């Protein structure tokens, strides 16, 4: 079953992205490098 997740910037704490994942196949937390519009650089975003 797919669930909606929010990706939170690790440096400023803003919730910048909404995504979905399959909890059955990927139970671990998502971490990805994304663009943060507040800081205007690419930063690490984690599932929140």
Swiss-Prot record:
One of its GO terms (molecular function) is structural constituent of ribosome. One of its GO terms (cellular component) is cytoplasm. It holds the Pfam family Ribosomal_L33. It comes from Lactococcus lactis subsp. lactis (strain IL1403). Keywords: Ribonucleoprotein, Ribosomal protein. It comes from the Bacteria. Coiled coil: none annotated. This is Large ribosomal subunit protein bL33A. The lineage of its organism: Bacteria, Bacillati, Bacillota, Bacilli, Lactobacillales. Transmembrane segments: none annotated. PANTHER family: 50S RIBOSOMAL PROTEIN L33, CHLOROPLASTIC, LARGE RIBOSOMAL SUBUNIT PROTEIN BL33A. Disulfide bonds: none annotated. Belongs to the bacterial ribosomal protein bL33 family. Signal peptide: none annotated. GO terms for biological process: translation. InterPro entries: Ribosomal_bL33, Ribosomal_bL33_CS, Ribosomal_bL33_sf, Ribosomal_zn-bd.
């Amino acid at each position: 079953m797919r669930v909606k997740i929010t990706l939170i910037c690790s440096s400023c704490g803003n919730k910048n992205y909404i995504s979905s994942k399959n909890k059955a196949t990927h139970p671990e937390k998502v971490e990805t490098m994304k663009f943060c519009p507040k800081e205007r650089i690419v930063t690490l975003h984690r599932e929140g």
